[in-house]
Amino acid sequence: MKSDPLVTIYIPCRNYGRFLRQCVESVFQQLYSNWELVIVDECSDDDTIEVAEELCRRFPSKAKLLRNSKPAGLQRLANSILGIANGKYMIRLDADDWLDESALLVMVAKLESLPNSGLVYGNYFYTDSNGKVLGIERQHKLASEGNFRYLPPHGACTMFRTRSLRAVGGYSEDVKAQDGWELWYKLFNRINPTNVDVPIFYYRQHDESLSRDQNRLLNARSRIFERLSHSLSGDYNLKNVAVIPVKESYPGFEGVPFQKFGDSSLLERAINTAVKSSKVSSVVVSSSSQRVLDYAKELEFSGAVPTHLRVLRSTEAESRNIPIRDLMTHAGEYFFSQSGEYPDAVAFLSIHAVYRSESHINEAFNVLRVTESDTVVSVKEERDPMFVYGEEGLELVNPGRFDDLTYDRERLYRFNGSIIASWWDVLKQHHLFGEKIAFVEMSAEDSMQITKPSLLKVASEKSL
């Protein structure tokens, strides 16, 4: 190594005194010795302070403890460290995790050998709450398989060039989770991310892990994409059309759009949710039933729903399922006939997705824009073990699930039927999805579809 630049390591800690000693000891044992350590206590009421003070006394010139009078939150804390960091590079180590002894050595060597790169990440071990190794996450595959733009590396133990973090304004303090996602997209086009194909830290899984709070993570991710999309805004306003295809009846489920869910019908709910989306320019209700369109018109005239477009599809298609792409292009062509302009993007919105919100629709269009994907689909993650048929019988696709682990390489997603958003040029090229497909993840609850009368009661009870 030509030089040994200083590395700033910071450890946020709130009531993780039982883990802190192992965490800090892993810093002390690094093969690379030019580091400074800042432990930040977030108003712990366990023995965090005592443990931290004892550890800092061992390296008084290199380690110090900061005590916040009230919890600052991860993003605000990170910005405060960014303001005082002396290191050329900066890395966050969570108090319940710990570093491999070679972590700093290999990451600094990588960045020093690539002066145009300002971010490096590596693999990591999963452990249980007692520190027993359960498996390994190999993050290098994210880049080698071309998915790295949409699947950022773990936010902790990713090493950044400190100057690069400062140049993009650090962390957004109103985003309370998924800090790795935000920085990844803020830095992606400014620096060249790189990786080391070795495990650099141990990631402890336990009941208090933030990564297990799915709704908080999904909400934070949605806000991040909203912020990123806004940063791309110019004087050209995208024309995004949302189409709600409506079939009047199915076998065993009559009068679908007229069915009540809470205080409104399924159609009324779908239209209002779509119109509330700040990313949607125009809403089109598409049906082969004139009765359905008349009902939509009545809803508009009564003030129950805002102004929207209505288009009658050929009645020849009444008895068959119409390909989703055809529904979307038909709506786009109708939009052109009314406005004289083709849409930039079209979103399919299922009338059956009663828990889909305007924020889900916004996120779909934001992801489509930020990731430059051809299509975005709404999905829910399959969290149960799944099998496929192989040469010797069934083969387990995601064995980590039996150890309660979620490897990125084993993540499986099911289309939940709620949203498909595609660029118009992709649809016109006779593709529904195109080549590059991104996703909006929705919770199992938000993914619920009303496909039969009995589910109306179940969904209504859930909403109480």
PLM segments and residue spans:
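Short, acidic, metal-binding catalytic loop of nucleotide-sugar glycosyltransferases
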Residues: 25-34, 273-280
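Conserved core of the sugar-phosphate nucleotidyltransferase
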Residues: 131, 326-330, 342-345, 351-443
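Acidic donor-binding/catalytic loop of UDP-sugar-dependent glycosyltransferases
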Residues: 47, 97-110, 322, 350-367
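Conserved donor NDP-sugar-binding/catalytic core segment of glycosyltransferases
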Residues: 102-134, 367-374
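Conserved nucleotide-sugar donor-binding catalytic segment
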Residues: 143-223
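A conserved acidic beta->alpha catalytic loop
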Residues: 41-50, 70, 94, 288-293
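Glycine-rich, basic loop-to-helix element that forms the pyrophosphate-binding segment
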Residues: 68-85, 322-327
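Short aromatic/hydrophobic "clamp" motif used to bind/position activated sugar donors
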Residues: 90, 346
